[in-house]
Amino acid sequence: MAARRKAGVADEPDRPALGPGSIVRAPGHAGLWQITAWEWRDTGIELDLARYASLAGASQPADGGAAWSPPDRLPVETRLRAFELPWDGTGQSSVPQRYAAVSAPAGRWGGAMLYRESADTLVPIGHSGPQRAVGGILAEALPPSPGLRFEATARVRVRLDDYEAALEPAGLDAIARGSNRLLIGGEIVQFAQCEPEGNGLWQLCGLLRGRGGTEIEALAGHEPGAPVTLLDDRLVPLPANPYPGDGDRIAAIGAGDDAPVLAEIENSGRTCRPLLPVHPRSEQDALGNLALRWTRRARGGWSWPDGVEQPLVEQDELYEVGLGDPDRPARIWATPGPQLVLEAGEIAALGESDEGAALWVRQKGSFAVSPPLHLISLSTLAERKMP
C-alpha cells in the first residue's frame, strides 16, 4: 500500500474518528501505519498510509551518571626511603644511580609529589605515580654472613608497610639474573622462597648475601627494625647529578601528609666507589722480602666470568697499600697492579716503628677509593721469624 499525499480536505461533521496522524494496523500488511490523509469515495473512505517508525528509543531519557566522589577511607601517610645503589653494569659508570622508594600503608593513596632539597628550599622533581614501592622493616635480627655462597637454610622475617603487597619466589636461575633483590640496611640480599604469615609479615628463606659488593654490611648483620626495600621497577629514579647547593635529602608530599616527608639519601657515592679487593695473600722469601698480592674486582661485575678478566671500569688500575689507620696512614705505597713487594730492610724498619700496625690495600678509582682490605699485621710477620 503506497503512501500518497492529498491536500484541500475539508472538515466534515460526520468525518471518521480516525484522521491524519492516527496510528493503525492495515489488514494484510505487517507493522504499524500512520494515516497521512483520507478521502470519501463512493465505495467508502480511502486512507493514505505511511509506515510508522517509532521514535521511542531515541526519546528515552539517558542516565547522566554520577560524579566521582572519594572513598570513605581517609588518605594514608606517605612512606619514603632514598638511596644510592652500586653500579649495576648498565648505563654510564660515572652517573650515580639514585632512587626513591615511595609507598604507603594499605589504604587510599594516589602517590606523592617529590622534591629535592636545594639551598634550604624544596624544588619539584616530579610525581611518584600511584604505584607503591614494596618496603618495610626487619621483624627480627639478620645475623652476620660472609656472603660467599647461597645459604639455602638461612631465614629472615620482614614486615611490609602495605599488608596488601605480595612477594614472589624465584629459582636459582632467576636469582642469578638479579631477581628478588632486597636492600636491607646497606646490604643487597636476594631470596628464593617467601611465605606470608599475615598482616604484612613474611618469612624469607634461601638467601644470597652481600650482593653488589655489600659484603662489609653482610659481615656486620642487621638489627630488628632495619629498613627493607624491594629493588624493582617500582622505584622512582632520582636526578643523577646533584645541583650546586643540593643536599642529600629529598621530600615527598601526598594527599594524606600534613607536612613534607623527608629522607636522607643513603649510601651517597656508592655508585662510583670501587669494590673492596678480595683474596689477600702474603709470602715471605728466605731473604725476608714480603710479597703481597690480592684480587681486584670491578664495579658492575655481579658475576665471575670464567677464563677472562673482569673489565676494569676505572680509567686506570691503581692501588694504595698503607700501614696503620686508613684515615691517617703512617706509610703509603702506590702500585699499578694487584701486588707489591717490600724488601726485608723496609719490613724491619716498619716493625720498629709500630709492631701492632697492619698493612692494607684499597683500589684508587676514577672518582673514589674502595674500602681497605686487611693484608697482614706486622705482629704476624714477627711471629713468622720466631724459631
Each language-model region and where it sits:
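C-terminal extracytoplasmic interaction modules
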Residues: 1-387
